[in-house]
Amino acid sequence: MKIYYDQDADLSLLADKTVAIIGYGSQGHAHAQNLRDSGVKVVIGQRPGGPNWELAKENGFTPMSAAEAAAAADLIMILVPDQHQKAVYEKDVLPHLKPGKMLLFAHGFNIHFQQIVPPADVDVAMVAPKGPGHLVRRVYTEGAGVPCLIAIHQNATGKAMETALAYAKGVGGTRGGVLTTTFKEETETDLFGEQAVLCGGAAELVKAGFETLCEAGYQPEIAYFECLHELKLIVDLMYEGGLSRMRYSISDTAEYGDYVSGPRVVTDETRAEMRQILKEIQDGTFARDFIMENMSGRAHFLSMRRINAEHPIEKVGAKLRGMMSWLKK
């Protein structure tokens, strides 16, 4: 894998360019402010009237419509949520995609699944910081950077990689390292990680553990501490030094239980389901379902959200978190 650093990127390639950030949300505010602090001219495309419009003004920008920003820019980074990107692209961006411009994304969903099909005469790239926007901004202001992924989908100008690397340098990515990937790889692995491990897998594991203890007669408050609250302690150790750091830091009792009981939770059947989840991502089944869900009004999605919000673990957790002064800061 090729990894790029500061010395591999030329920020001067953006000296006479204007970058449009479409969507001033979690990633948008970080990209915009970091680029500006790197000396790049930035315009903000944001829906008027909302909190992000006001936040952009508070941060010293003069926000405008997405169409106005796209018209004014040479590089256009689309950072609105996945389900809104196609509509924003077709209505506000496409009419202003002149030959030689660059279209940028921080996630490959809409390009990989062909919800957005740019004209052949523009560059299309991805620069994806591997951290939330507030971290991307904070680390940049501290003189470092969050590592990024970079991918090229179209190289109409012959300089797409150089331009994308300049953008990555502007947001601070080359300070930490910019790793090469493809739109396909980033999209499929990102979706799999979210569904099987980080969100779907972890949430269901936490709920199942909580329910198992409660059904066995243990107090819900104790079950919450053991199955949800303490998860952060373990994940932080893994985040800082991998599984080995976590196992070094826990008790021998916990480590032994890890080895003998973990494989009984993640069984061969679990692994088979994980492979099936990956297959449905790869063949487009998940993407089609998600796209159709949004097109049909999101009734099923909203129902699942409501049902999960009413799970007993949420009520117990709200009460216990109210006792934790450090969470109120």
Curated annotation (Swiss-Prot):
Q: Name one GO biological process term.
A: isoleucine biosynthetic process
Boundaries of every KARI C-terminal knotted domain copy: 182-327
Q: What is its EC number?
A: 1.1.1.86
Query: Which SUPFAM superfamilies does the UniProt entry name for this protein?
Result: 6-phosphogluconate dehydrogenase C-terminal domain-like, NAD(P)-binding Rossmann-fold domains
Q: Where does Mg(2+) 2 bind?
A: D190, E226, E230
Write one Pfam family the protein is assigned to.
KARI_N
The pathway to which it is assigned is: Amino-acid biosynthesis; L-isoleucine biosynthesis; L-isoleucine from 2-oxobutanoate: step 2/4; Amino-acid biosynthesis; L-valine biosynthesis; L-valine from pyruvate: step 2/4
Q: Which residues are named in the active-site annotation?
A: H107
InterPro entries with a match to the protein in the record: 6-PGluconate_DH-like_C_sf, KARI, KARI_C, KARI_N, KARI_prok, NAD(P)-bd_dom_sf
Q: Which residues bind NADP(+)?
A: Y24, G25, S26, Q27, R47, D82, Q83, H84, Q85, G133
Keywords for this protein: Amino-acid biosynthesis, Branched-chain amino acid biosynthesis, Magnesium, Metal-binding, NADP, Oxidoreductase
Sum up the protein's function in the record's words. Answer: Involved in the biosynthesis of branched-chain amino acids (BCAA). Catalyzes an alkyl-migration followed by a ketol-acid reduction of (S)-2-acetolactate (S2AL) to yield (R)-2,3-dihydroxy-isovalerate. In the isomerase reaction, S2AL is rearranged via a Mg-dependent methyl migration to produce 3-hydroxy-3-methyl-2-ketobutyrate (HMKB). In the reductase reaction, this 2-ketoacid undergoes a metal-dependent reduction by NADPH to yield (R)-2,3-dihydroxy-isovalerate.
| UniProt-recorded name of the protein | Ketol-acid reductoisomerase (NADP(+))
